[in-house]
Structure formats: C-alpha cells, structure tokens
Design a protein with these regions (language model features):
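ATP-binding catalytic core of ATPases
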Residues: 112, 218-266
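Hydrophobic alpha-helical transmembrane segments in multi-pass integral membrane proteins
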Residues: 25-35
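Hydrophobic alpha-helical transmembrane segments
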Residues: 1, 29, 45-74, 80-195, ...
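Signature of the cytosolic headpiece of P-type E1-E2 ATPases
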Residues: 250-354
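Asp-based phosphoryl-transfer active-site loop
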Residues: 186-213
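Cytoplasmic-side transmembrane-helix entry/capping segments in multi-pass membrane proteins
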Residues: 9-20
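C-terminal ends of transmembrane helices
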Residues: 2-7
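Loop-to-transmembrane alpha-helix initiation sites
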Residues: 34-46
Length: 424
C-alpha cells in the first residue's frame, strides 16, 4: 500500500494505489460494523492484500534473478532487430550489448501494468460515484459500506499477479540459460513474425565437429588429396574448416587458391584447385554427379572427395549433438511466427541431415542460396540500436529461449489482462 501511495505522488496510479484507498474504505466501514453489529469485508480485503504481497515478492524475485544473471556474466551479447532482413520479415540478430541496455528499460512499466493503472483509476472514480449516490439516498453508513464493497468487487484478487507471475516463471527459465529480457520494450521487440539466422557455431559449436578417420583411394598421394580437398573446404567456410586446416598442418601441406567455386545446395560443393576439378559432398551427391563409389565405402557421416571424376578419399566426420543447440533449434521450430534461416557454410548441413540429427520438422526452416547467405551474413545491427535481450552465454538455447519466451509472456500477460478486465 505504501508503494501505491508513493506512485500517486510520482504521478502514477496502479492497483496498489487502489488497494490503499480500499484499505481506508474498509477501515471506516469496519468502524460502522461495530456500531451496527454486522460482518465487515475483512476476508475479501485480506485476499487482495495477499495477492498484492505475492505480486511484490514475484517482482522482487524477478529483479534479483536478472541482476544475478548479469553479475555472473563475462561477456554480454545482445539480440537486436533488423528491419526487412529476409522475405520482408525483420531479423533477430546477435551483436554486442551493454548493461545499460537492461538498466534503462527493466524498471519501466509494461503495457499490461499501464492498463491496470487506467482500470484502477476508473474503478475508483466509478465506485466513489456510486457510493456518493447511495449515501445521498440512504445515508452515509450505507454509502461507506457500498464504497468498500464495490472497491473489493471491482478488482479480482488474481489481477495483481496476472503479469508478475508469468514474468517470474519465465525469468527462472531464462536464468538457467544466462539470459535477461530488456523490459517490456524487449518483449514487444521480440514478438511478431521474424527471421532468426542460424550460423555454423550455433548448431555445432567449436569442438563439436571432429575427424574420426580417413581412407584414401586411387594413385594420388594422400598429401595432394588433403591439400586439394582442404583448400576447397576453406573456400566454402563453415565448421569443417578448422578440422581440415588441422589436417593440413599435421601433413605439412599448403592451401591453394580455388577457382569456379560452386555450392550445389544438395550436400556438395565443387571447384578447380591447381587446375584439377574437385568435388566434395555426401555419398548421394557424388553418385548423382556420376562418380563411381566402390562397394564397402558406406559411411553415414562422411565427406567424399573426388578429383577429376575419381573417388580419392572418404573423410569420416563426427558431428556431436549438443544439448543446448538441440533445445534451441527445437524451440525455434516450435513457434510459427519464427522462421529459422540457415546461414551455415558447411555444405553437409542439409535439410535431411538436420532432420535426422535433431529430430525437428524442417519444412519451416529456410535454406537460402549462397549469394543470399553471404548478403545476410554481412548485415550488421545498428550500433545505436538498443538490445531487446541480453545473453551471457554463446549458446543457441540462450537466444532461442529469449525470443520464444518473450512471445509467450506477451500472450499470457495480454490474455490475463483481458480476462480480468472482463471479470472486473
């Protein structure tokens, strides 16, 4: 109640302010009850008071959790919106962030809280009007009784926690992945239809892709095969680059320039290296390109290398399924208004591979052409743009939970406000 009175002096009116007036009306009515020997409205007021205290506790817990997340942070990354990013949709991209992005917005009242304040003020004025009219007709005692009763009836008790409860539940979930939302402005900015770019390090962080072994075919020397294939993979980019660069270093071979590079988009790439046509890709890709594959070379996850139309090597690759990446991708694919856009340079990350690896439905995942990918990768958020959410970990699940959680919070808070307005 003191918070409510303090808000009035600051030029704001909220549910706690209405609760303070309700307390005064109930106290005056209780004094009349002693004289008239009737039961006051103490039970109903105690229920509203309990809910108001619960809302304050939840808000306090949310703020402490957010501060604790930022306190433990080593590096901050922000989620910023870029207009007209892909297919007419804005993009939610990650960039640098500062603590001020959160501190400037976290204490601002949200849209549901503003609606609550307007509703509380209107309810107070209407209740006073009804009480004055009743007092003029039936006396002051009945007017006070009607004022106290109408104020209690005007606001459902659960209205106090219609926003703070969903926010507290979401904060606990975000705290586990090291993420905070930048106030209601961040919630609004993360809502609506948007594209979410996914890079190689999002799906398979550094160290999750390893070389399990290699088998060479034909008469070419292994060093020559490694040099040609590694050069082509370096030109393609992606998570395989560190693996093959380490292989080149171990064999003490040099990288060569690549000409006529081409990404076929079906799990394979090609180009000319030292005047030799080189093809790299999955087993099905090389077979479709007319390369003869000997029997007994069936490997589930492998890069097949063909030079001048002849199979020269099979590199067995291990893609470790990280729980954070899997949880983030599943979460993004579960929201219709979010469109994941694959910007990975790794040609092995095809639609079929992602479906089998992560068990997600890929019909909503977009696989743009190489030219479009390069254009999107070069787009950077405005340095002056405020961050909508801040993540403290380099994990896909941290950003994904912020996006989907903000949408769920806005829906829950809006629905709760509408229901309580109708109920009041």
């Amino acid at each position: 109640m003191l918070d409510g009175l303090g808000s009035i002096f600051k030029g704001r009116f909220n549910l706690n302010s209405l609760l303070a007036f309700t307390f005064i009306a109930c106290c005056v009515d209780a004094a009349s009850c002693l004289v008239e020997v009737r039961v006051p409205c103490c039970a109903a007021f105690c229920l509203e008071m309990t809910m108001a205290m619960a809302a304050r506790c939840q808000r306090r817990s949310t703020e402490m959790g957010q501060m604790d997340t930022l306190r433990k942070a080593v590096r901050l990354k922000g989620i910023t919106k870029i207009s007209d990013y892909y297919g007419g949709m804005p993009g939610l991209v990650q960039g640098e962030a500062e603590v001020e992005d959160f501190m400037d917005t976290y204490s601002l009242p949200s849209a549901p809280e503003k609606v609550q304040g307007v509703y509380a003020l209107l309810s107070l004025l209407i209740c006073i009007g009804i009480a004055v009219f009743a007092g003029m007709l039936h006396g002051i005692s009945l007017g006070v009784q009607i004022l106290a009763t109408s104020l209690l009836v005007a606001v459902p008790a659960s209205f106090f926690i219609s926003y703070t409860r969903p926010m507290a539940v979401l904060e606990k979930r975000l705290h586990m992945v090291g993420t905070v939302l930048c106030g209601w402005e961040g919630v609004k900015g993360l809502s609506g239809k948007a594209a979410f770019p996914l890079r190689d390090e999002d799906l398979f962080p550094l160290g999750s892709t390893k070389l399990n072994g290699v088998k060479f075919y034909g008469r070419r020397s292994p060093d020559e095969v490694v040099a040609l294939t590694a050069s082509l993979i370096t030109a393609a980019g992606g998570g395989l680059v560190p693996v093959f660069q380490q292989l080149m270093k171990n064999r003490n071979v040099e990288e060569h320039p690549v000409k006529n590079f081409q990404n076929y988009g079906t799990g394979g790439i090609g180009g000319e290296v030292c005047g030799e046509p080189v093809l790299l890709g999955s087993l099905n890709f090389l077979q479709d390109m007319g390369v003869v594959i000997p029997e007994g070379t069936m490997v589930n996850q492998a890069v097949y290398a063909a030079i001048d139309g002849q199979l020269c090597a099979v590199f067995a690759i291990s893609y470790a399924k990280m729980r954070s990446a899997a949880a983030g991708l599943v979460t993004l694919c579960g929201h219709r208004s979010v469109t994941p856009v694959i910007l990975c340079g790794d040609f092995m990350l095809t639609e079929g591979f992602l479906q089998s690896k992560f068990g997600v439905k890929t019909r909503r995942i977009v696989f743009p052409t190489r030219e479009v990918r390069n254009d999107l990768l070069n787009r950077r958020p405005d340095p002056e743009a405020a961050a909508l959410a801040i993540t403290t970990r380099d994990e896909l699940v941290s950003a994904a939970y912020a996006v989907t959680g903000a949408r769920s919070l806005r829906s829950a808070a809006t629905l709760g406000t509408v229901i309580h307005l109708i109920g009041g």
